[in-house]
Amino acid sequence: MPTTNQLVVNGRENKVRKQNAPALNLSFNTLTKSARKLPAPFKRGVCTRVATMTPKKPNSASRKYARVKLSNGMEITAYIGGEGHNLQEHSVVLIRGGRVKDLPGVRYHIVRGTQDLAGVANRKQGRSLYGAKKEKK
């Protein structure tokens, strides 16, 4: 335990917190060719690969994911939620934060119903996260 005098002279050092979604914090300036800190809730990117992955134990499935080259130059792995999708290579997508617990290295989600990714078809409840429009009566 430090003495009061030691604290006055040196002070306490703040803990550095690790970012959960670091790609959302950087923005790339094309004129100066430099990255700078500019946090954003979403980022746009282009799919470079669309594939499936098996989750960690004890789960079993084939989870859909996409490798995305973001507008800030970073390449990330993002999860495609919902049943069925129309993504292909070179599709433009919108990325939000949020990891997938049973897929190692997947720290982002792709937003459904925006850019080139359609919403989930025939979804009646919990439509907001899946980009599904309200059904007409």
UniProtKB/Swiss-Prot annotation:
Pfam families: Ribosom_S12_S23. SUPFAM superfamilies: Nucleic acid-binding proteins. The keyword DNA damage does not apply. The modification 3-methylthioaspartic acid is found at D102. Keywords: Methylation, Ribonucleoprotein, Ribosomal protein, RNA-binding, rRNA-binding, tRNA-binding. GO terms for molecular function: rRNA binding; structural constituent of ribosome; tRNA binding. The keyword Transmembrane does not apply. Disulfide bonds: none annotated. Part of the 30S ribosomal subunit. Contacts proteins S8 and S17. May interact with IF1 in the 30S initiation complex. Belongs to the universal ribosomal protein uS12 family. This is Small ribosomal subunit protein uS12. It comes from Mycoplasmopsis agalactiae (strain NCTC 10123 / CIP 59.7 / PG2). The lineage of its organism: Bacteria, Bacillati, Mycoplasmatota, Mycoplasmoidales, Metamycoplasmataceae. The gene is rpsL.
